């Protein structure tokens, strides 16, 4: 743009520092997903993959990601990882979970259940955060013009296909792009590598790998019939093998959307594990939406990924442990490892040397570390060998 104030001629140019990916390319779709993840304003829901990245004007779609542009997915998940903060949600106090362990980076069909209480199983489900937490109208609301989103926020009608344990993809191009970005672009940080982790690996293999093995460093994986997995919010599951629990009293009976386990014939994998870290009497274990209503946790917690664990302090579902060393006396292990407080823990079951060796190995885990087999791997292979029930995703 040229401007002339009578004194001098000013020339304004938009000079690209690099050529962005071409519309229609894989790299462009990933970049659009990044924009959708980090904008607190919004982008169009659909017909976005042919639009040059510089042609998106998020302020024209304010009110979609959040009301008054106060928050985005990236506000808590910086770089797609974690801010380390414990927030009070509808399920209770929850430390932000990093997204680097959501997918196996070798297999986009290897997806863990999501949230500490396994109440979701797709990035698409988190459109409900844009609406119910950030008070925007979300990224599946093309039936409303951007002005309505800004004015009405989450009072606009929700897309009926998007709910916890609803569709994995197909809600909108913007949500599918977010999913693509989480798989293709979010990566664990490289950790300092000690000279020798052999001793710690042996301790890990014997005591931790069954839950924290696998390419995502968690056994949590969707094996049940999905997309959607349930007929409606809090509705019946579409796969009879899913055991779905309501939170234990005194928690309100709904939402009853914790996916506790999946059974195929005589084989069962648990998603929620009780490791003795939920104290129902603690006044911090409250939910954000119901007075005197206790948080989820009595049934256990969805096994977290240990990818990059050295970087993601504090630890446990509400950040009770500031360091990995502090986890050991709190985390149940062995015959008395469930219930609060656990009578046997990592600290009581392992010698001081074993704990030191384990700590060295845990701090080294990153995307380059060879993983161990988990219960999830064993379950998948056993179901395949039977040749019954819905076949698990390819490994």
Predicted regions and their residues:
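Periplasmic c-type cytochrome electron-transfer domains
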Residues: 1-395
